[in-house]
Amino acid sequence: MVAGVVDPTKLVFVDECGTHTSLAPVYGYSPKGERLRLSVARNRGKNTTLLASITLEGMGPSLAVEGSTTAEVFEAYLEHVLLPELGEGRVIIMDSLPAHKPGRVRELIEGRGCELLYLSGYSPDYNPIEEAFSKIKDILRRACARTREALLEALGEALSAISLRDAQGFFEHAGYHSMGQLL
């Protein structure tokens, strides 16, 4: 199945993104002749992983967990967070991370009347959620969240910042042309 054959309104891209409490802006401004000063946490703290989905309508259900993604965490995300929100006939697309491969993943997805597709290796250009994660990380850098609670709050705000127009643009850029025109 390729982008030109399937209705892009049925596509759901799923991926994960790691973040931590020492993210800081990569550039800034200061008065002419003065050096910009910014303190950055030396201790990254534990990694927080965001499991999320994106459709042409925008960001879908997400889950933030401490640590990395395991098969058990991913299965729980599918079973309790993502799949209850999806209707039948959706095509769920993800990369081939080992945590995405257990047989139960396919069983859960197909049991809900959806289809599972894996992207070929080294093909993040075909996954519109990668661009959403780029925007999310930019927002997180500006937020300078230094505690887990502040990071989770900033993640919620960053997810909300992905607009319908953003999502449609991410899909277009990845080669999944929508049936209609961008608004």
Segments the model singles out, each with a brief description of its role:
Residues 1-183:
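Short functional hotspots at interaction and active-site rims
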